[in-house]
Amino acid sequence: MPKVDLSSIEETNSTGYPEPYASDVARRRYRRVGAATGLARLGMTHCTLEPGGWSSQRHWHEGIDEIVIMLDGEAVLVENDGETVLRPGDLATFAADVANGHHLVNRSSRNCSFVAIDNRDRKSVV
């Protein structure tokens, strides 16, 4: 099954965040592509942010490397060093164990989408 049909993977906007933090990600929809396709060592999430949507609360990872690949639209990467606009084809990488709190925010007037990929280390802490 090399080619993945995204429409065959359940899309959700569920969150584990309690209020008031959950409302920040209410305009986020995502598909857990890695889990749905049987990847055991890589996590992959396809995410769509509606205008005003956040990808998550700002966070960083112990034991997990992460890469974000912008697919469509425009999002603002918010991190410790400031803010950077990401457009289709742009990449952002986050090395494990570097305390750089980050997330994406859609400040544009249309949806944007990206893929986030990380290594699945069972000892990791987010």
Annotate the PLM regions:
Residues 80-97:
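Short acidic-glycine-tyrosine-enriched beta hairpin
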Residues 50-54, 74, 83, 98-100, ...:
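Short, charged/polar surface micro-motifs in flexible loops or helix N-caps
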Residues 1-41, 51:
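A short, N-terminal "cap"/entry segment at the start of jelly-roll beta-barrel domains
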Residues 125-126:
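Conserved small/polar residues in nucleotide/adenosyl-binding loops
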Residues 46-50, 60-78, 117-119:
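Short, conserved beta-strand element in jelly-roll/cupin
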Residues 38, 96-122:
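Ligand-binding loop in jelly-roll beta-barrel domains
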Residues 29-30, 45-61, 99:
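Conserved short histidine dyad/triad with adjacent acidic residue
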